[in-house]
Curated annotation (Swiss-Prot):
Homodimer. Gene3D superfamilies: Aspartate Aminotransferase, domain 1 (3.90.1150.10), Type I PLP-dependent aspartate aminotransferase-like (Major domain) (3.40.640.10). It comes from Bacillus anthracis. This is 2-aminoethylphosphonate--pyruvate transaminase. The modification N6-(pyridoxal phosphate)lysine is found at residue 194.
Amino acid sequence: MTENHYLLLTPGPLTTTKTVKEVMLYDWCTWDVEYNTMVQKVRAKLVSLATKEEEKYTTVLMQGSGTFSVEAVIGSVIPKNGKLLVCTNGAYGKRIVQMAEMLHIDVVVSQTEEWEPTNIVEVEKILQQDKEITHIAVVHCETTTGIINPIVDVCKLGKQYGKVTLVDAMSSFGGIEIDIAELQIDFLISSANKCIQGVPGFGFVIAQRDELLKCKGQARSLSLDLYDQWETMENQNGKWRFTSPTHVVHAFYQALLELEKEGGVRARYNRYYNNQKLLVNRMGEIGFKPLVNEKYQSPIITSFIYPEGNFEFQQLYNELKRYGFVIYPGKISKVDTFRIGNIGDVHEEDINRLVDSIAKGVVIG
């Protein structure tokens, strides 16, 4: 077991480094110039991670979980006469649909099975038939299963038909290389406690400046007004409109520095990729099969199908927790699965220890 109480093999919150945790021992004032300067550095670093064309984009930090930032985008970006196309194959795509419905935004859905990627042919057919669609949203890595959706093709189609593109990159940004300018993404949403390896407390939106400027006065919420949040940060040197999670921001800044030290997004992707491949190979040796086809599988989290015979997930969970590991239950309805994450401060020796614990026979009868 590591210095942590448990090794979190989850898609976030995840296992953080000792140094990320240590910076949260200090208190910060939200009005302090040093703190607000740190906020500005965070915003700039996020844009530089996202694209080489930095002048075209800006970052908005938003208190709360990643879902708060997604809802801030949905509620602020789409005008009253707008219409949203959502590509969904899991819980997080469905959540965007639910947000749109709650906010009385006209919404149409392109839905595929949870283990199948977004169907580009169907998406284009919908765009051809429905001229009222103004925006298109897709989840990059759907952690319901661990599947990767074809955001390159979705965004290319979106721009081909003149739509504003929204990408939920909650569980991929910082762990998979993305150039939002090349992909023509107008709004990308992610969170502090995912591949950057910070802790929960805020999400962020990397926005195309010209599109963000169009959002002024459109928000359907005071606290989730994306434009107002950005304008305050922009004009008041990193100040948030309402109380910000100071400890979380400091931890995130430290996590960004550690990402750079590791070698950037490509190096982190390689570690996650190697973790995932090792996990699947080792689990296969003891009878566990992944749900998602290898060509659609992300390096973020892997869903495994329940093996035949006397298998109980809760027994597996309890025994692994006793050995110092925490994994995730399944989240789909048609197939019994459980999930194991590959991200965070997790390395190949951790994956080997995990599978060794499962293989001992104490969890599978």
